[in-house]
Amino acid sequence: VHLSFENMSIYTKICGINDTKSGLLCSNLGADALGFIRYEKSPRFVELDVPLKIQENLDKELDIVFVFVNPSEKEVKTVIEKFPNSIIQFHGEEPAEFCESFGKKYIKAFHAYNLRYWKNYMDLYSSAHAFLIDSGNSVQKGGTGIAFDWKLIPKTEKEKIIVAGGINSSNVSDL
């Protein structure tokens, strides 16, 4: 599993891939990771056949990330069986023990409006390989396409932080 931030100024994960053509295009354009939503309430939910087809056609190594929101143990294990080198991203209220129980690198997501609890969060999920800060809100878990105030990003542990939400060609240099 790649997910290494060493010698890398920007790690690019394109999330919400739901068709083979888009996934391969993102790979060809230099993405470091592709994210697949495994939350059935999301309009970007994807069945496992799509990432399987993409993985079969990749001509380079990149991270495959599966995004879950409060999944069952069975849901996560099914993905791990089919994609043993994948990375799991937990985007709900999963307990740290649950996230750790699969013995894999994982990303723990939380919303920018909870940044005041950053230190507690890092302590609670100390086994997380990275933290994803998203601009989600109390209604929508993520995928809002809205940027948050990046000045709020904690100054410590920056190598473990992935920023999500509203990033585009006109504002990415502000990160």
Sequence positions of predicted segments:
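Conserved N-terminal beta1-alpha1 strand-loop-helix module at the mouth
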Residues: 3-175
